[in-house]
A protein has these predicted regions:
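Beta1/beta-strand and adjacent pyrophosphate-binding region of the FAD-binding site
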Residues: 1-11
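Glycine-rich FAD pyrophosphate-binding loop
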Residues: 8, 20-43
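A short, Lys/Arg-enriched amphipathic alpha-helix followed by its capping loop at the start of a domain
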Residues: 15-28, 54, 111
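N-terminal FAD cofactor-binding segment of flavoenzymes
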Residues: 37-83
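Short beta-strand to alpha-helix junction loop
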Residues: 46, 89-109, 200-203
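Predominantly flavin-linked oxidoreductase catalytic cores and closely associated redox partners
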Residues: 110-216, 247
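FAD/FMN-dependent oxidoreductases across multiple families
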Residues: 198-252
């Protein structure tokens, strides 16, 4: 059986690593096709439990070429009516991780665990038994249903403090909430390790930026807007939508 993945963002890389690792003792060919001219995002990312074991195909925290940091849970600040802070702590015998998408991509493509093809293709034209479409956010939202979300914009910043905690932070703000991803200072994603989320139909970008800088000691780097959506037909014959090609909803 042959499985092809189109796209080398987070979803594409993790899908390829998953099938190459768990299918290594089976008659399974794994191929990742990507356009090298499309760069992955530089925003700091965080996984749930389980993802680090996929990187165990060649990753460890001693030879940490992707500058990942351990994630032991999620700290919520300012959301509780009784407690100012509360933590969703992971079991002590497990770990998730914080990572940079472009460094993860380089690691995955050079891992030697699957075939890599540089090309810009339509998933329906790929010769494989099953094809995962991981090409990221669509340009055409035909077939997608909007999802309700209180936020639709983000301001990204570089922390000016030592952000080496072993957990992600989600902080309630006057305009929505903010995430703080503890990234290695040498990682490109350190420039987008803090994100201030808000609704630009309610809060002006200038006001959100002012509040961001008042609450956090950051160097503002860039702004972006986004849609929240879900495709209603995730499987079309042998093509399966994955990652942001399937849906997007800003996590908390």
């Amino acid at each position: 059986m042959k499985i092809s993945i189109v796209g080398a963002g987070n979803a594409g890389c993790f899908t390829a690593l998953y099938y190459s690792w768990y299918g290594r003792k089976k008659d399974l060919e794994v191929e990742l096709i990507h356009d090298p001219n499309i760069a992955p995002q530089e925003v700091g990312q965080a996984t749930l439990l389980g993802a680090p074991e996929l990187l165990g195909t060649g990753f460890n925290y001693y030879d940490n070429h992707i500058h990942a940091t351990p994630k032991t849970g999620i700290l919520y600040e300012g959301f509780g009516k009784v407690n100012e802070k509360f933590i969703h702590a992971f079991p002590t015998n497990t770990l998730a991780m914080h990572f940079c998408p472009c460094e993860l991509q380089k690691f995955a493509l050079e891992s030697g665990r699957f075939n890599v093809v540089e090309d810009n293709v339509d998933p329906k034209d790929v010769d494989a038994d099953y094809v995962f479409d991981c090409r990221g956010t669509p340009k055409d939202f035909t077939g997608y249903t909007p999802l309700k979300s209180p936020v639709n914009a983000a301001i990204l910043g570089k922390p000016k403090w030592d952000s080496k905690e072993l957990w992600s932070r989600h902080v309630a703000t006057p305009d929505g909430w903010a995430f703080v991803i503890p990234m290695d200072e040498s990682s490109p994603s350190h420039n987008g390790a803090v994100g201030y989320l808000y609704n630009n139909k309610i809060t002006k970008t200038e006001d959100a930026k002012k509040n961001f800088e008042q609450i956090f000691d950051v160097e503002v780097k860039r702004e972006r807007t986004f849609k929240s959506y879900l495709h209603m037909n995730p499987i079309d014959d042998r093509v399966i939508l994955q990652g942001n090609r399937l849906f997007f909803l800003e996590p908390m």
